[in-house]
Regions:
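Short, small/polar-rich motifs associated with maturation and membrane association
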Residues: 1-8, 12-374, 382-383, 388, ...
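Hydrophobic beta-strand positions
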Residues: 35, 50, 58, 400, ...
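Short, solvent-exposed loop/turn motifs
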Residues: 42, 84-87, 191-192, 364, ...
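Short aromatic-centered micro-motifs
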Residues: 48, 78, 185, 585, ...
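Extracellular/periplasmic, surface-exposed regions of secreted and cell-surface proteins
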Residues: 135, 140, 182, 284-285, ...
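Conserved small-residue
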Residues: 251-297, 745, 762-861, 980
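Extracytoplasmic gating/loop element in the C-terminal half of outer-membrane beta-barrel translocons
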Residues: 291-293, 437, 602, 834, ...
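Glycine-rich, aromatic-lined ligand/substrate-binding cores of catalytic
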Residues: 861-893
């Protein structure tokens, strides 16, 4: 509390010694009013001055102002960046409710930042704001898709082709090895917990895309440090739509979509397979005869059986208005039903959004109430079925048949599986696993989840001293999820469980999450003459609670399989306590200064290391406001920005890493024999570091914003350097010094640097024609600079599992290299450039191939350059647009090719798998050595360009006497991909760039309708 009082005292001192807001506010002719845009939305920060004097004020959060002029004939001038300036005499009735028109040549507007807003022209940090009209169009279900390719420095890696799949978002690369690299998501001033449980893992999935007004991405520390300990990976602020205008308006948006599989795993057709078997395993040999005997007489395309054409639809209705100019409101409901391209997969979502903003006491007191609810149901199809369908024998019947040809439902419910016997006598071949159809239809894995995100924000502007206001924010984010995972009676999976005995079984897992927020800050915003001061200090308290519980039952008897713990032992909680402040000061809108400070305490650390102080500072020079450029017709904007700051990281994967924790032993050798009572399992201690502390990231940023020809050409360029210290890493402990061989501790460092740019062009802008083109790109490089206490050049951490091989780890973390750098054997090729099976380079020249012959490549999944491109073209009521993104210098290990590069068959396994078409190219027919799986021949350049969406629409502004509007549009998503990568898709879900057999992302055709009443 002492920290907060110190900050507040600073504000009061500033208030005491700051010059008066105007020179004549206590006498003369009073003018009061509200300034709004053409949609009725209040404009915050508009300048209202008495022309020819220094008497001026700025509009408040509701666009309101009050000024005393010399007399009724005085000229009042109202201006705001990006809007046309209006001059009226003080007695004009138009000033009571003044609507500003947008200036087509202006490029600036108000941007939401942490704990407030700022004019874009006054920003000092690296901040990018994306408004609704700039979002990616199309049948968007996942909110993160609206940002894809839009923001330089923001890399969005989509999930697989499953409905509701989560994307991986990185802002300026990774800043940690073992802690989270996800950005902080803040929705309407409520920081969101990342872990929402199954079905709610992605916080952006909880928001209906149609409810979003804008995104603001805080990239550098000078902008993000106000969020302190959670801002090392950047901050994404999501602002939802609010009430506006006066007349109630109803809007509907809906779409119907058809999704098709964009690609299949490249395996042989039944005909190709038979021909190849005849060539490689001809009859007349022992092996050939056995292989030939396993050929069937059917032609089965298993991938066709498991994939389908999916139909999806989405509907949203919203009501927006303002009651008596005192209560803006907005309410919306939405429903999404999305089939997956894999049979049985499905995603449903229902959303409700409500916003009320009543104001009292002549708009000095404003209450903002936001409530968002979402209910989801997601059935997961087994991701393993994609690979299983690709390699199941294409010459066998997909079903067990009776003698009359009908399906034999008594044997594994009719679906073909490897085993012996029929009916109840069926014995599964557990080494081979369930068949593709059994995986889909005999298992139901469905998560149903509910989430509520809401807050009540009370903002009071002090009567008689309107420059000072107080803000109280009470927020709640609560979610619950229940996951059902069931195996049908009589299924292959039921027979593989010796306890189930063919009955089948099911389990329930419940997850509960609660995030409570209390924040209070004071803000002083004053303008006098050429000076503008905006200072804020606040306090934040946040509590996170979670509990998880699961239990299993048998289908036949519903008896419990395991113990049902009525009081879950995995309840966890953590707290964040913070004091923060920010000071913005500008002189003549030319010289801009920003200083922020946040003091955070996290219960995840001990009392000795709990507090972390995160400062930042920035300076910007509005060069375009200087006299030598102010009247320039060519240069409309030019601003230089410089910033430095520190942010922290406390999302370290554990709530109690500094405490000694005990775990129930699962090893029978770690038990105490109790005679007839059986074995008593020990509680064994885990390793811990009582001095574990924050990871700290220091960021340096230099940027230039520019605009030419009245904003027809505009953009920005940024250079940044991020250095993370006290990086968490698992290190080997000296014998006897801790309760484990390794312990997680602060010991490493890493560096991330890059250059970002953003370019926007308006080459055509006439009455009927408008053309806008946008392009942004990011060059980046990341490497470790320290990983342990010694300078051992050979120290490394191996990671990244592949399907085959011993140890299965293909990647490495090492000083001087990027995270997840590939660690391979070097392939040997013949004189024609063909790979020689099991021939690898003996790099240490000891006459044999060992692990010592692997080498650290200079290749990683992290792209050297990634970019986005967009185009919008309109002619009268027609509009056309597209969005695309791509990357260069990213590498992928084709694990699908590695694991299936030979036609060698284990004839004793009892099955005949299909072959990848790759075997015709490699010519590999023998068994691969353990080292061949790691060959760099499977490491491929996965640079690509993806056309994300193409859209064509027409807007009906008037139909008869109807005063509403309607837009009809057709679009295609995931249109095409240009790449040299041989796999299904060059964008691999996650961050490690290892491509097994991913669920292909579908191509979507959508018809959309938007109606405004």
């Amino acid at each position: 509390m002492k920290r907060f009082l110190t900050m507040c005292a600073g504000i009061l001192l500033i208030c005491q010694f700051t010059p008066p807001l105007t020179l004549a506010q206590n006498a003369g002719y009073e003018v009061k009013g509200v300034v709004v845009d053409k949609s009725g939305m209040p404009i915050l920060g508009a300048t209202v001055v008495e022309k020819g004097t220094t008497n001026g004020v700025s509009t408040g959060i509701d666009g309101d102002y009050a000024i005393r002029a010399a007399g009724p004939e005085s000229v009042i001038e109202v201006s705001y960046v990006g809007y046309k300036t209006v001059s009226l005499v003080a007695s004009s009735s138009l000033l009571a409710h003044l609507t500003l028109e947008e200036d087509a040549m202006g490029i600036d507007d108000v941007v939401v930042i942490g704990y407030g807003t700022v004019k874009k022209n006054d920003m000092t940090g690296s901040v990018v704001a994306i408004k609704a009209e700039e979002f990616n169009r199309g049948a968007v279900v996942s909110t993160q898709d609206m940002l894809k390719g839009k923001v330089p420095g923001v890399h969005i890696i989509p999930g697989d082709g499953g409905p509701g799949s989560s994307a991986t978002i990185r802002v300026r690369g990774a800043a940690s090895l073992n802690a989270s690299n996800d950005p902080l998501i803040v929705i309407d001033e409520v920081p969101i917990a990342v872990d929402g449980g199954k079905g709610m893992a992605n916080p952006l999935e909880t928001i209906n895309p149609n409810d979003i007004e804008s995104f603001t991405v805080l990239k550098d520390a000078s902008a993000a440090a106000i969020y302190g300990s959670r801002a090392s990976n950047g901050v994404i602020l999501v602002t939802t739509k609010k009430g506006r205008g006066n007349t109630p308006r109803v809007s509907y948006s809906g779409s119907v979509s058809v999704q098709t599989n964009s690609d299949e795993l490249p395996v042989m057709s039944p005909g190709e397979f038979r021909t190849y078997i005849d060539q490689v395993y001809p009859a007349g040999t022992t092996t050939g005869d056995k292989v030939q005997s396993m050929l069937g007489d059917k032609n089965t395309n298993w991938q066709d059986l498991v994939f389908r054409t999916a139909i999806s639809h989405d509907h949203n209705v919203s009501l927006i208005g303002n009651i008596n100019d005192r209560m803006p409101y907005r309410a919306s409901v939405g429903y999404t039903n999305q089939q997956g391209t894999l049979e049985t997969s499905k995603y449903e979502r229902g959303t409700l959004d409500l916003s009320l903003s009543p104001n009292f006491f002549d708009k000095h007191l404003t209450v903002n109430l936001n409530a968002k609810g979402v209910v989801t149901s997601q059935r997961y199809a087994s991701g393993g079925v994609v690979g299983s369908a690709a390699f199941f024998n294409p010459t066998i019947d997909p079903y067990f048949r009776n003698d009359d040809g009908s399906i034999d439902y008594t044997t594994t419910n009719g679906y073909w599986n490897y085993g012996s016997g029929r009916g109840e006598d069926f014995t599964p071949n557990t080494l081979l696993g369930a068949g593709p159809l059994s995986q889909l239809y005999d298992r139901d894995n469905t998560a149903r989840a509910k989430r509520f995100i809401g807050n009540a924000q009370i903002d009071y502007k002090v009567h008689g001293f309107e420059a000072l206001r107080f803000n109280l924010n009470l927020g709640l984010d609560v979610s619950s999820a229940k996951t059902y995972d069931g195996v049908n009676p009589g299924s292959f999976q039921a027979y593989t469980d010796t306890e189930a005995r063919g009955w089948g079984q099911y389990s329930w897992t419940t997850n509960f999450r609660r995030n409570q927020l209390l924040e209070f800050y004071a803000n002083f915003n004053k303008e006098w003459g050429i000076h503008h001061l905006d200072v804020m200090a606040g306090y934040s308290w946040q509590h996170f609670y979670s509990s998880d519980h699961s239990v299993s039952y048998f289908n036949e008897t519903h008896e419990q399989k395991g113990e049902d713990s009525r009081y879950p032992f995995n309840r966890q909680e953590n707290y964040l306590l913070s004091f923060y402040g920010r000071l913005n000061y500008s002189i003549a809108s030319k010289y801009l200064f920003t200083f922020t400070l946040r003091d955070d305490a996290s219960s995840r650390f001990s009392k000795d290391t709990r507090w972390g102080l995160f400062p930042s500072g920035a300076f910007a020079w509005n060069i375009a406001e200087e006299n030598f450029l102010k009247d320039s017709r060519a240069v409309s904007a030019l601003k230089l920005r410089v910033g430095v700051g520190q942010t922290g990281q406390q999302e370290i994967g554990s709530n109690y890493p500094y405490l000694a924790r005990y775990y129930m032993s699962t090893d029978v050798y770690k038990t105490y024999y109790m005679g007839s009572a059986g074995h008593m399992f020990y509680l064994t201690p885990g390793a811990y570091d009582p001095n574990i502390k924050w990871e700290t990231t220091t960021t340096y940023n230099v940027g230039l914003d520019f605009g030419f020809l009245g904003g027809r050409i505009n953009g920005s360029v940024d250079w940044y350097l991020r250095q993370t210290d006290d990086l968490l890493n698992s290190v080997i402990t000296p014998m006897g010094s801790n309760f484990g061989n390794t312990v997680l501790t602060n010991i490493g460092s890493m560096e991330n640097k890059g250059v970002e740019f953003n370019l926007n062009f308006i080459p055509v802008q006439t009455k009927d024609w408008n053309l806008t083109v946008g392009f942004n790109g990011t060059f980046q490089h990341t490497e470790f600079t320290k990983l342990n206490n010694t300078d051992d050049p050979d120290y490394n951490i191996q990671t990244g599992s592949i399907t085959k091989g011993t140890g299965n780890l293909l990647q490495i973390h090492k000083v001087g290299y990027a995270p997840y750098t590939f660690y391979c054997f070097q392939q040997v090729y013949d004189q024609d450039g063909n790979p020689i099976q099991n021939a690898l380079v003996d790099r240490d020249k000891d006459g044999k191939i060992t692990q010592a012959d692997r080498y650290v490549t200079d290749k990683s999944p992290n792209p050297d350059f990634f970019y986005g491109i967009s185009l919008k073209l309109s002619y009268k009521n027609w509009d056309f647009g597209f969005n695309g993104h791509g990357s260069a210098g990213n590498w992928v290990f084709n694990d699908f090719a590695s694991a299936n590069s030979t036609s060698n068959i284990d004839i004793n396994a009892g099955n005949l798998p299909n072959f990848a078409r790759l075997v015709k190219k490699t010519g590999f027919t023998k068994a691969n050595s353990g080292e061949q799986w790691y060959s760099d021949m499977f490491l491929e350049n996965a640079s690509f360009f993806r056309m994300d969406d193409i859209n064509l629409g027409y807007t009906f502004n008037k139909i008869g006497n109807w005063k509403g509007s309607m837009r009809v549009a057709f679009g295609v998503q995931n249109v095409f991909v240009i790449t040299d990568y041989s796999g299904v898709d060059p964008e691999i879900p996650g961050v490690n760039g290892i491509d097994g057999s991913i669920w292909p992302r579908p191509r979507t055709y959508s018809l959309r309708l938007n109606v405004n009443f």
